[in-house]
Amino acid sequence: MTVLDRFLKYVTFDTQSNEETGTTPSTPGQRVFAEALVKELEAIGMEEISLDENSYVMATLPANTDEKIPTIGFIAHLDTSPDMSGKNVQPRIVTYLGGDIVLDAEENVVLSQSMFPELSDYKGQDIIVTNGKTLLGADDKGGVAAIVASMQYLKDHPEIKHGKIRIAFTPDEEIGQGADHFDVEKFGCDWGYTIDGGQIGELEYENFNAAGAKIIFKGLNVHPGYAKDKMQNASLRAIEFASWLPAEQRPEHTTGYEGFFHLTGMTGSVEEATLSYIIRDHDRKLFEEKKELLRTLVDKMNEAHPGCAHLELRDQYYNMREVVEPQKHIVDLAFEAMTSVGVEPIVKPIRGGTDGARLSFMGLPCPNIFAGGLNFHGRYEFLPVRSLEKSMETVIKIIELSARKS
């Protein structure tokens, strides 16, 4: 089975995560997918295969040489984003010759070159697209496919000498819980790589520092006809609070290393209103300043309206750079591997996070490598077939180079 065959099979599993369930995995489809992967790993001859109660899959490709070689891990996640349906995904492969791609003629859903100019980079290539009704799931079933296919390749090519290789598939990465129950000691690696990046060539060892915030506003409701000097409208307090945050620090106005406040949700009535934010910044100092600004503004609101606002603030993950940079050789190894298979590395900060960010702080330095997809989390997601194949080749080459250098 080719890496493409595996990917097309994997996207048929509905594994959309859900942060509201409070379970691990957060949705039953992830367990179904995990169990199917266990059977595939058994079929290709992997060893030490485990599936725990939280649906973490781990397996081993034993060393085929007596040389002392570091144990490397490769990790991808089972779930797809809760932002868009992952049910009944119907991928199709088109040879892209330029222009727009009609995904759903009936609903006029078009993958437009003017809106997504990166399409032009793949002219002449086969690309996998959606039917315009769901996401594709390249994030991160592209990574899962690349890892499983690379293990199959190494089993079929014993002439490629390698050390012990560990692989893992995790649930609920998309809702920030992918590392919650990851057993780093059991995984037993010197370092790892998540195969969870985007376009071909992406190599990332910097990510956002991240926090989540919820501000709850209390009001007082009375009959609006008799509300003068009595009513306190919680929804209006929430709107006022949102206006105090710097508009230039919203996601739509930031890029590169610029952080942001992102209003992800709001609910409201006169009696109670809630604003949900995520706070992001690559720089730890600026990250802390953003959190402090929220605290200051909540205090300001409560000074004007005593007891009106309550802040719930929780750190989610931190920038892995401070852990990975002292072991830069693991980034250099991936860089060399990409170059060796004809891929130009694109080293840039992740404007997001991966399981590897938290795992790095849990004792497993873990940069991120491309899986090949673009426009994640929506109906315009697509995956060039060559990019998927090169992701697999990069995994194999990392393993091969690690053995040679040892």
From Swiss-Prot:
Reaction catalysed by this enzyme: Release of the N-terminal residue from a tripeptide
Cofactor requirements of the protein: Zn(2+)
Disulfide bond positions: none
Keyword vocabulary terms for this entry: Aminopeptidase, Cytoplasm, Hydrolase, Metal-binding, Metalloprotease, Protease, Zinc
Membrane-spanning parts: none
Main location: cytoplasm
UniProt KW ATP-binding keyword: no
Subcellular location, record wording: Cytoplasm
Domain of life: Bacteria
Active site as annotated: D79, E173 (proton acceptor)
Cofactor note: Binds 2 Zn(2+) ions per subunit.
Binding-site residues, Zn(2+) 1: H77, D139, D196
EC id: 3.4.11.4
InterPro entries listed in its UniProt record: ArgE/DapE_CS, Bact_exopeptidase_dim_dom, Peptidase_M20, Peptidase_M20_dimer, Peptidase_M20B
UniProt GO MF annotations: metallopeptidase activity; tripeptide aminopeptidase activity; zinc ion binding
Residues binding Zn(2+) 2: D139, E174, H377
PROSITE patterns, sorted: ARGE_DAPE_CPG2_1 (PS00758), ARGE_DAPE_CPG2_2 (PS00759)
GO cellular component: cytosol
GO biological process: peptide catabolic process; proteolysis
Family: Belongs to the peptidase M20B family.
Chain's role: Cleaves the N-terminal amino acid of tripeptides.
Protein known as: Peptidase T
